[in-house]
Every structure is written in structure tokens, then in C-alpha cells.
Amino acid sequence: ARSMYEPFNRIKFAQFASYYDQMRAGVKYFVEQKDKKSVCAMYQHTDFGRDVYSGAVDQVKAMNMTIVAETSHKPTDTDFSASLARLRNARCDLIAVGTIVRDTDMILSTAKKMGWDVTFLGQFASYDTGVAEAPGDIGEGFYSMSPSLIAYPDDPRASVQEFSRAYKSRFGINPNFMGEMGYAAAQVVILALDRAERELTLEKFLAAMEGIQGYRDIFGSPPITMSPTDHHWLDPGMASGGKEWPLGAGGRWMALGRARLASRAGPPQRPP
């Protein structure tokens, strides 16, 4: 959420770009690089969903466009037939979605049953193996913004394989992207605690966090650099995750391209 790093707060650190910024970057990418002309929106009627929706609205406005049609739903809704029919009638060619995993899967499944081949664009909350590996190949044509790509258990890097084995041994399932990023976040905090040493104070911990420069996690995320005026961990460049279906295998997220954040020209500044 934008509230994690805007405005600046000396005891807040943000790991990723906000949902708002992710959607702005994604919409800009698809309009400019994929020639999308009719942008629509589907979103949860929650603070989260409205933040995603705001990103889509502000980006199309910045490009002298408008949202052609939109629908909202409760997180508990299960029937999306009418909503999708409305968007189909509006001739949308890109649907920006403020959804998570469960409602994303139901929306994609419904669209496939309708025979509607349209591009859906999600954000970090929908960048999950639960979408990519959903039965029936429903994830084909769905894209999500993400700070980096998920590292699968068969990744050639020994450190990733070791993490995946330990994770599955403890929890009984392979790690998803949220699991990987949670581990990466913990490693950054541990690094700062080590540098702050045993006589820990708030000031020493903040100084240690702000002194992290160019740290790379084991998953290949962009380098993490912070400072006394910038508590936003990752570079504002975003990877746009697409998805493909290899023959005889489950769905996997694949890189589509990179898009700069549309609304964040630089780090938030500490107030005087």
C-alpha cells in the first residue's frame, strides 16, 4: 500500500511498489507496447481493490484515455457472469483487475467458459502459483505485475533449492512467491540486526537498515538499497509477469517485460 512509504515515516520500510503504482506501470506498458485501446476494470470493493482501480484510472487519464467500463464486487462473491458480460459488451481489450487469488481464478474460469479471449492484468496480490497452476489452463492470457520472478524448486541455484526443500519439509507444500518474499524480507531484517549488534536501540536499527546498499536476495530480486531519505527497498523498475503453459507441465510464470513506475519519479523525501 502507498501508506507504507508515502509520506515518509522514519520507522516504516516498504519492500515493494504499491498496488497503485504497479497498476499504473502495467496499464502504461500494455497501452504503449501491446497497443491496447479499451481499458476496463474489475476490482474488489475494498481498500485494496480501490487502490488498484485508482492506479488504472490515473494512468489512463495521464494518457488522455478513460476507463471504458468497470465492475466491482465483494471479496465473497462467486458469480461473475453478469460483470464479464457487461465488460464484453463494452468491447474491452484490457481488463485491469484489483483481485487476489480466489476471485482471480473464478473470473478467469468464467471468461473461459464464455469463450472470451481478452487480456487481464493483475498486480502483486494475484501473482501466485494458485493462479498460474489453476486447473483448466484458465491462466492463459493473464498477466501480473511483480517486482521479480518467482524462483521454482527446480531452479539451478543451490541456495534456492535448499530453501525450497526446507520450506516444503516444514509446511508440506512448495513455496509460492509470497513465501519467497517473506523469507527475503526476514533476511534483510536479520542483516540489519547483525549490523546493529547486541546493544540494540531504535536508532541503531534504523541506521543499520538505512545503511543497506545493493543487497541481493537468493531469488534474484532487484538489489535493495536504502538511505536516511529513502526507505523503499526495491528499485521502482517492475517486471511484468506473463504466463505460459509448457506442454505436459503445469503453468509457470514467465517474464514478459519491464515497466517503469508511472507515478513515482523518485524516493519520498524526509520532511525537514
Residue ranges of model-derived segments:
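Beta-alpha junction/loop-to-helix N-cap segments that form part of ligand/metal-binding clefts
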Residues: 1-5, 73-80, 100-105
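Extracellular/periplasmic periplasmic-binding protein-like sensory domains
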Residues: 9, 108-183, 194-196, 200, ...
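Extracytoplasmic ligand/sensor domains, especially the bilobed periplasmic-binding protein
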Residues: 1-70, 119-144
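Hydrophobic alpha-helical segments within soluble ligand-binding/sensing domains
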Residues: 15-38, 79-81, 104, 130, ...
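Acidic, proline/serine/threonine- and glycine-rich low-complexity intrinsically disordered segments
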Residues: 232, 236-268, 272
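Periplasmic-binding protein-like
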Residues: 40-43, 91-101, 107, 118-123, ...
